[in-house]
Regions:
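S-adenosyl-L-methionine-dependent methyltransferase catalytic core, i.e., the SAM/SAH-binding region
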Residues: 1-173
Length: 173
């Protein structure tokens, strides 16, 4: 198998890169879709194999520089769409046949360590927490919702057992 260890030197690399590459077998060539591009770890590893083509999506505008760099390196073999993966059907042509589709769900270190993004609990700052194309920040939600709504958000969307105490403390501030 090809050595893909250089893709682990990225500012953020996918934790399961080896396993995904082994599973999707890009050494055979093919068409791939990366629905959560991020810094391009999976996409670039796949494109390092000849006869591969990748269409990538990411809703996060902060990844555009990574996508531009990948486009420079792989040209027509790479296509990027700044879209949510829920819009995949609008982005992919009906006759496109993917050999493998990747979804690496969750937050990335790119988002956590950029303090302006408001995902970290380790620093004071605006609570933004937008993954990408949203117009409403977490700060907006906190400032506009009532105590009951905030408790429900924490309980049902955050699976937080202590939602009442947390919501009360947020409202106090």
């Amino acid at each position: 198998m090809k050595d893909i260890s250089s893709f682990k030197n990225l500012s953020h690399y996918p934790v399961m890169l080896d396993q995904v590459i082994e599973l999707c077998s890009p050494e055979k060539g093919g068409h791939f879709i990366d629905c959560t591009f991020g810094s391009g770890g999976y996409t670039n590893a796949i494109l390092s194999f000849s006869n591969t083509r990748v269409i990538s999506l990411d809703r996060d505008k902060y990844v555009l520089n990574y996508a531009s760099e990948t486009k420079r390196n792989y040209k027509e073999r790479f296509t990027f769409h700044n879209e949510k993966f829920s819009n995949l059907d609008k982005v992919i042509k009906k006759d496109f046949k993917a050999d493998f589709i990747i979804f690496d769900l969750g937050i990335s270190s790119l988002q956590i360590f950029n303090l302006d993004r408001g995902f970290s609990f380790n620093a004071k700052g605006k609570v933004d927490m937008r993954m990408g194309l949203n117009s409403v920040s977490a700060q907006d939600v906190l400032n506009k919702c009532d105590l009951k709504t905030l408790k429900n958000i924490l309980r049902y969307f955050g699976d937080e057992k202590d939602s009442s105490r947390i919501a009360n403390n947020i409202v106090k501030e």
